Curated annotation (Swiss-Prot):
NCBIfam families: PRK04199.1-4 (NF003239), uL16_euk_arch (TIGR00279). It is linked to Autism, X-linked 5: A complex multifactorial, pervasive developmental disorder characterized by impairments in reciprocal social interaction and communication, restricted and stereotyped patterns of interests and activities, and the presence of developmental abnormalities by 3 years of age. Most individuals with autism also manifest moderate intellectual disability. Intellectual developmental disorder, X-linked, syndromic 35: A syndrome characterized by intellectual deficit, delayed psychomotor development, poor speech, and dysmorphic features. There is a cross-link at K175 (Glycyl lysine isopeptide (Lys-Gly) (interchain with G-Cter in SUMO2)). The keyword Secreted does not apply. This is Large ribosomal subunit protein uL16. One of its GO terms (cellular component) is membrane. InterPro entries: Ribosomal_uL16 (IPR047873), Ribosomal_uL16_CS_euk_arc (IPR018255), Ribosomal_uL16_dom (IPR016180), Ribosomal_uL16_euk_arch (IPR001197), Ribosomal_uL16_sf (IPR036920). The gene is RPL10. It is found in: Cytoplasm. Pfam families: Ribosomal_L16. One of its GO terms (biological process) is cytoplasmic translation. The modification Citrulline is found at R32. Belongs to the universal ribosomal protein uL16 family. Keywords: Autism, Autism spectrum disorder, Citrullination, Cytoplasm, Developmental protein, Disease variant, Intellectual disability, Isopeptide bond, Ribonucleoprotein, Ribosomal protein, Ubl conjugation.
């Protein structure tokens, strides 16, 4: 018996059911890589950030997440080069879905019990997504805005339900507004740290502040 179609598991009906010592024998999720492209690019290299935002409360299978990741990556590599972007899948499939296997061969009624003992065996994993939750983000250079929108539009076709594409006002994957970011870095209130930044608050030891601004 093959994999049941994902439309059977689209809606969030039950409580979250993660892999645990009580729920064993769960097959591995199809998606294993969540960051691709130029992951180690400094925070100031990729100021533009685009998000794919869910418009429904639903479940997305790990197969769909993997398909969307491959689709977006393929388009971005073709249009921006393999070092011109950084994609991050923001969902992780932790919810385990079950299947109560039914036999369909001749004489099956003697072998199986129908709906008696109908609690199924683990079949795969899905990610539960809320309205307004980000599914996937891409950061890149400002001139690649159209390519980001097109890559996310193509990836949208891999998912059920509705998604929106949103170009963020923040700088890259940080939580700081793009129009204030460079000023805050110049004032040393933000210190670049990989693909993120460290925020230096205006309180604390004075000698530490002097050492930073010397």
């Amino acid at each position: 018996m093959g994999r049941r179609p994902a439309r059977c598991y689209r809606y969030c009906k039950n409580k979250p059911y993660p892999k645990s010592r009580f729920c064993r024998g769960v097959p591995d999720a199809k998606i294993r890589i969540f960051d691709l492209g130029r992951k180690k690019a400094k925070v100031d290299e990729f100021p533009l950030c685009g998000h794919m935002v869910s418009d429904e409360y639903e479940q997305l299978s790990s197969e769909a997440l993997e398909a969307a990741r491959i689709c977006a990556n393929k388009y971005m590599v073709k249009s921006c080069g393999k070092d011109g972007f950084h994609i991050r899948v923001r969902l992780h499939p932790f919810h385990v879905i079950r299947i109560n296997k039914m036999l369909s061969c001749a004489g099956a009624d003697r072998l199986q019990t129908g709906m008696r003992g109908a609690f199924g065996k683990p079949q795969g994993t899905v990610a539960r997504v809320h309205i307004g939750q980000v599914i996937m983000s891409i950061r890149t250079k400002l001139q690649n805005k159209e390519h980001v929108i097109e890559a996310l539009r193509r990836a949208k076709f891999k998912f059920p339900g509705r998604q929106k594409i949103h170009i963020s006002k923040k700088w890259g994957f940080t939580k700081f507004n793009a129009d204030e970011f460079e000023d805050m870095v110049a004032e040393k209130r933000l210190i670049p740290d990989g693909c993120g930044v460290k925020y230096i608050p205006s309180r604390g030891p004075l000698d530490k502040w002097r050492a930073l601004h010397s």
